């Protein structure tokens, strides 16, 4: 934290709480989209991430991903179990550790939507910490202070490190896991749109901490990121329902919710670097791109159950690349970057090139290692539930409980 005064520390702590609140929001969002017999499994997959990742983060994650005394590729273990981190800076470092730990927790949770309805919870329990250490931590280091950042790529709050990373990992995971029984012949509509909309509202609320909190202070850049987050989400949701209205004859609640999330994803990498009407354009472009991208799974036959690839991978990639066009050098605050001008603000292709390189590296690393982790799990403990469990539902088969009891209605 550049200036750990009481106001800045307080804002980062509040932002950390907002980001934590996003995980149950994501659980509701995914849970509502899932089927009644699997909704508790989806909730558990999300909440498991906030059980195991904070412990892993304090043990080694923060030290490996953020320690400045490592190198441009990986940190070291000097801050193992927060060794040496005290209150000498008014608690500023502890606040940042907590804040970034919330990011680490929600990132693997994003992947859960792609593998819905058929992944063993035992495999998920191993996948989450292993993936976080081998995939998330290195990419986070490279993007935020490591060699990709030193080259000049920009990522304000995690478009590349979180959304592109988790989105392409979701694709690798479903390619190993295989399709759900009956997909795509059988439709799998959301079982509860009210849950989806509640989850969307919670995500939108929490995302202000996700993006504005990444300024690491209560300052002008935080206000800028806050406003950009608000505008991009609205524009993307609008773009999605307008496309639906024209194409299908009606706007849907699911389309509005998906569009809002797509806009939130897309503005994440750019929130602190763009100004004026730029977030509206980013939202409109991302909303349209993701609206069409979610249909690619049917064309190419990969069963991304809850559209993680179409929304998070595509949305994050679009938002990150658009920095190369919309970055405004007058709105970088204290961010030191080799390239600050987008093409529309007097820049050249160098920033766009660095954005493309950073995302390309993240895509290759994340896909390859995720695929390898899933293959290893498949050959050892197995990754897919038995046919009977998939048919009866993962809630009863894996957790011994159900979300809805008919007896409770009497």
Residue ranges and their predicted role:
Residues 1-410:
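Glycine- and aromatic-enriched membrane alpha-helices
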């Amino acid at each position: 934290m550049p200036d750990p005064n009481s106001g800045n520390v307080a804002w980062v702590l509040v932002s950390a709480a907002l980001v934590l609140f996003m995980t149950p929001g994501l659980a509701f969002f995914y849970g509502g989209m899932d089927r009644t017999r699997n909704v508790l499994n989806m909730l558990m997959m999300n909440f498991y991430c906030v059980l195991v990742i904070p412990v892993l983060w304090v043990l080694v994650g923060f030290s490996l991903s953020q320690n400045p005394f490592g190198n441009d590729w990986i940190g070291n273990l000097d801050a193992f179990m927060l060794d040496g981190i005290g209150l000498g800076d008014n608690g500023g470092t502890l606040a940042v550790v907590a804040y970034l730990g919330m990011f680490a927790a929600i990132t693997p949770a994003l992947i859960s939507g792609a593998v819905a309805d058929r992944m063993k919870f035992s495999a998920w329990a191993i996948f989450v910490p292993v993936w976080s250490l081998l995939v998330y931590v290195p990419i986070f280091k490279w993007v935020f202070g490591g060699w990709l950042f030193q080259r000049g790529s920009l990522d304000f709050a995690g478009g590349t490190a979180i959304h592109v990373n988790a989105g392409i990992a979701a694709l690798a995971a479903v390619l190993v896991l295989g399709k759900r029984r009956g997909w795509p012949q059988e439709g799998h509509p959301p079982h509860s749109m009210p849950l989806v909309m509640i989850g969307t509202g919670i995500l939108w609320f929490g995302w202000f901490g996700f993006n504005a909190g990444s300024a690491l202070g209560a300052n002008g850049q935080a206000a800028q990121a806050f406003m950009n987050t608000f505008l991009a989400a609205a524009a993307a949701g609008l773009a999605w329902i307008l496309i639906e209205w024209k194409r299908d004859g009606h706007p849907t609640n699911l389309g509005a919710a998906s569009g809002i999330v797509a806009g939130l994803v897309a503005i994440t990498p750019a929130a602190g670097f763009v100004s004026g009407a730029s977030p509206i354009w980013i939202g409109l472009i991302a909303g349209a791109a993701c609206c069409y991208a979610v249909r690619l799974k049917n064309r190419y036959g990969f069963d991304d159950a809850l559209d993680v690839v179409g929304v998070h991978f595509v949305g994050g990639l679009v938002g990150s690349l658009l920095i190369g066009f919309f970055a405004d050098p007058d709105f970088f605050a204290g961010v030191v970057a080799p390239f600050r001008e987008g093409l529309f603000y007097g820049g050249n292709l160098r920033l766009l090139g660095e954005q493309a390189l950073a995302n390309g590296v993240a895509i290759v690393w994340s896909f390859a290692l995720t695929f390898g982790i899933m293959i290893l799990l498949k050959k050892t403990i197995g990754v897919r539930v038995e046919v009977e469990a998939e048919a009866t539902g993962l809630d009863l088969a894996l957790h011994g409980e159900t979300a809805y009891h008919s007896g409770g209605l009497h």
